[in-house]
Amino acid sequence: MFNKENRQKARVKRHLRVRNKISGTAARPRLAVYRSEKNIYAQIIDDVARITLVSASTLDKEFAEKVGSNKEAAKAVGTMVAKRALEKGIEEVVFDRGGYVYHGRVKELADAAREAGLKF
């Protein structure tokens, strides 16, 4: 009943519902999170111009020693995406959890980004 395909479809439906309410602008871009089994990704996106301003993931060269998709890796990705955003002058974002429950790796990434200086 709740196999992987159905869970994925439900997540995509949740994400579409969230995306109808959330949109990133140049003043307040969107911090989008994607979680896979082996990695975690974060992007800061300007939806009006349709460009990715900043991105970070566990596949980056800086995370060679923190390979994986655990909470520690999510925390490192959150810190890195916030650091890169602040370097580009982005201080305030809208958080897009990507249809995932705000718990575990997604929450760790968000908390680390907040601690590093992003406001949302």
UniProtKB/Swiss-Prot annotation:
Which controlled-vocabulary keywords does the entry list?
Answer: Ribonucleoprotein, Ribosomal protein, RNA-binding, rRNA-binding
An example GO BP is: translation
Q: Which GO terms describe its molecular function?
A: 5S rRNA binding; structural constituent of ribosome
* Coiled coil start-end: none
Q: Which Gene3D superfamilies match?
A: 3.30.420.100
Instruction: Please tell me one Gene Ontology term that the record gives under cellular component.
Output: cytosolic large ribosomal subunit
A Pfam family recorded for this sequence? Ribosomal_L18p
Q: Which family does it belong to?
A: Belongs to the universal ribosomal protein uL18 family.
Official protein name in the record = Large ribosomal subunit protein uL18
Organism lineage string? Bacteria, Bacillati, Bacillota, Clostridia, Eubacteriales
User: What is this protein's gene name?
Assistant: rplR
